């Protein structure tokens, strides 16, 4: 048991050491910004494997109507000059993120239970046992068991979140049914703090507006992360020793 606990402490310390080394790398400097990368290489944004219908035939990006060669209007374009909406790998689509959520929960639990058991041993198979025991034992009260348990708990959650952002995402994959897998990242550095926004998900081409924008509520399997790194984020985090203590302390 002691060896397992020691191994757990060493593993947790190794993980914390990696995080500490990253923070030590820019002591006295502003936190570095990551270079431009392929959004498909971000964690969790690889090729998606989802239940799909039969693949559709690929459509031309700017199809023309062969039966009306003299017409200036194309059959598959919602605008007069063409369709600016993203529909191929590498295209860019603008995602409007407007989150305004609130949740309020109140839970109360009360439980109590008691039990009692008494037994005597004054006779056995018709034989009187009152004289079998010495004077220190009362055969009318051989065993007496009792238990009492109670539980009282309460919990409440009152949370309000509001985020309003706009980020450009890249189409990283076109699924067989035509849906688009998108991924985007945006970094903004202000003084010694880097704010990072990540978004991934699956969008329908029909939900993309004529201005090539889509709301985050129309993205399936959406993963939105808004955080940062720097001096302010470090000040809000507990010390790694305290984190280890909270993880390993069983009481």
Curated annotation (Swiss-Prot):
Belongs to the FlgH family. Residues 1-17 form the signal peptide. This is Flagellar L-ring protein. A lipid is attached at residue 18 (N-palmitoyl cysteine). PANTHER family: FLAGELLAR L-RING PROTEIN. It comes from the Bacteria. One of its GO terms (biological process) is bacterial-type flagellum-dependent cell motility. It is found in: Cell outer membrane; Bacterial flagellum basal body. Its main location: membrane. Keywords: Bacterial flagellum, Cell outer membrane, Lipoprotein, Membrane, Palmitate, Signal. GO terms for molecular function: cytoskeletal motor activity. The basal body constitutes a major portion of the flagellar organelle and consists of four rings (L,P,S, and M) mounted on a central rod. InterPro entries: Flag_Lring (IPR000527). It is a lipid-anchor.
């Amino acid at each position: 048991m002691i060896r397992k606990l020691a191994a757990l402490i060493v593993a947790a310390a190794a993980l914390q050491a990696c995080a500490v080394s990253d923070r030590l790398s820019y002591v006295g400097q502003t936190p570095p910004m990551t270079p431009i990368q392929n959004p498909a290489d971000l964690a969790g944004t690889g090729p998606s494997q989802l239940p799909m219908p039969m693949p559709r035939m690929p459509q031309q990006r700017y199809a023309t109507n062969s039966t009306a060669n003299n017409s200036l209007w194309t059959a598959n374009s919602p605008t007069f000059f063409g369709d600016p909406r993203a529909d191929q790998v590498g295209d860019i689509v603008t995602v409007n993120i407007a989150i305004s959520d609130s949740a309020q929960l109140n839970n109360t639990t009360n439980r109590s239970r008691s039990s009692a058991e008494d037994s005597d041993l004054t006779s056995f198979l018709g034989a009187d046992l009152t004289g079998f025991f010495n004077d220190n034992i009362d055969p009318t009260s051989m065993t007496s068991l009792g238990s009492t348990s109670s539980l009282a708990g309460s919990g409440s959650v009152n949370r309000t979140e509001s985020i309003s952002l706009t980020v450009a995402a890249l189409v990283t994959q076109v699924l067989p049914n035509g849906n688009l897998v998108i991924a985007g990242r945006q970094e903004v550095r202000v003084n010694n703090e880097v704010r990072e926004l990540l978004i991934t998900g699956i969008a329908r081409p029909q939900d993309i507006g004529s201005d090539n924008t889509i709301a985050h509520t129309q993205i399936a399997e959406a993963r939105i992360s808004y955080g940062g790194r720097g001096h302010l984020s470090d000040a809000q985090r507990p010390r790694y020793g305290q984190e280890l203590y909270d993880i390993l302390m069983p009481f």
